[in-house]
Amino acid sequence: MTKYFGTDGVRGIANKELSPEMAFRLGRTGGYVLTQHKEDASRRPLVLVARDTRISGQMLADALIAGLLSVGIEVLDLGVITTPAVAYLIKIQGADAGIQISASHNPVADNGIKFFGADGYKLSDDTEEEIEALLDAPEDKLPRPAAEGLGTVDDYPEGALKYTQFLEQTLADDLSGIHVCLDGANGATSGLVSRIFADLETDFDTMAISPDGLNINANVGSTHPQALSKFVVEKGADVGLAFDGDGDRCIAVDEQGNIVDGDKIMFILGSYMKSQGRLKQDTVVTTVMSNLGLYKALEANGMKSVQTAVGDRHVVEAMRKDGYNIGGEQSGHVILFDYHNTGDGMLTGIHLLNVMKKTGKKLSELAAPVQDYPQKLVNVKVADKENWQAYPEIQSAIDTVEKEMAGDGRVLVRPSGTEPLLRVMAEAKTEDLVSRYVDQIVDVVKQEMGSKED
């Protein structure tokens, strides 16, 4: 069976791999599968559809919606809105599913189609495979109703207001007295940030909130926070917040222009939650890519951590399974389960500002306990990435390095999820040490697996 779904929905270059024809088929198959499980059989199935600001978004949305309508599904078109807004509104509207058309932080030529179930969570592997089986079927045997059996579509701009009200209501007090610079990445947050931060009574300046269909994520946003860093210093602001194209990430900048990544944000929010007696099991959930500096800071401040595989989906799964209420990734996906079930950049941002206001501390002071260890990552081309652990010499090289580190560094070796690469990463006290450690392991990988560096 063809694997259409990646770690975050179906992605590709818009109008090529991700064509309008594919979007139509995803509407039919995905809509059909997701609405077969609805609890109330007496009403028509309802699906929410939204998109980010990419030029290809309208084309793919129209094709996707046509597919949904063709199997008798009612559609609420939310227009341009963030991914976490879709996840929230599914539950508020009592919808059977939600679909976001976005490639998140990727370049403008890319796009993606991301599905959420009736519970507002991303789909399980089993559900994705059910959709993939229908996509691969030699013949489309899904229903083709006529006349009154067809679905209808309604625009629903009110969704944005409901979502912004939800965000504002997660705070007990306003954020007056804070001067913040906001970078909308020319993406889905562009039309929302001014409303929210005005309602919360901040003093704010904005950049990258004028999308033209082509400038999403272009040298701005959470993957390029350097522009915001300069903007914060120019404006003399207390803090800057950079979002990504679909609004599920947030990277901050302190008053000196220093970047405060997802690791530091999780530490700041987790520490404050602990001080308020709200950090469940005194634990923060991270992925294996979080910096050793975060783990050292958590331990020094009486907190524990749980590590998952890379991807916010794995973080959410661990949080649901064991009852934790904060987790995330270095990239700025932060999940605050007390309020929402998915990463939400604006939710993260306003709660970071709330900690600044409640503690009276500057962001640089709040982030200071997390001292990043120098990190080096080398990708090595290999023929059989999944079986690297079968080579005892590689494991021996890792053991030797870890013994030298004596707890003051770490090694992570893992296969790439999409390419024939083995990723060798290490963190240590100094740049020289980390380079030596990585090179030691990479040399053995090349020797044992007959590979060459990409």
Curated annotation (Swiss-Prot):
Keyword check for Metal-binding: yes
Catalytic residues as annotated in Swiss-Prot or TrEMBL: S104 (phosphoserine intermediate)
Key words of the record: Isomerase, Magnesium, Metal-binding, Phosphoprotein
Regions that span the bilayer: none
GO cellular component terms, semicolon-separated: cytosol
GO biological processes: carbohydrate metabolic process; peptidoglycan biosynthetic process; UDP-N-acetylglucosamine biosynthetic process
Disulphides: none
Gene Ontology molecular functions: magnesium ion binding; phosphoglucosamine mutase activity; phosphomannomutase activity
Purpose: Catalyzes the conversion of glucosamine-6-phosphate to glucosamine-1-phosphate.
HAMAP family recorded: GlmM_B
Name of this protein: Phosphoglucosamine mutase
Protein species of origin: Lacticaseibacillus paracasei (strain ATCC 334 / BCRC 17002 / CCUG 31169 / CIP 107868 / KCTC 3260 / NRRL B-441)
Gene this protein is translated from: glmM
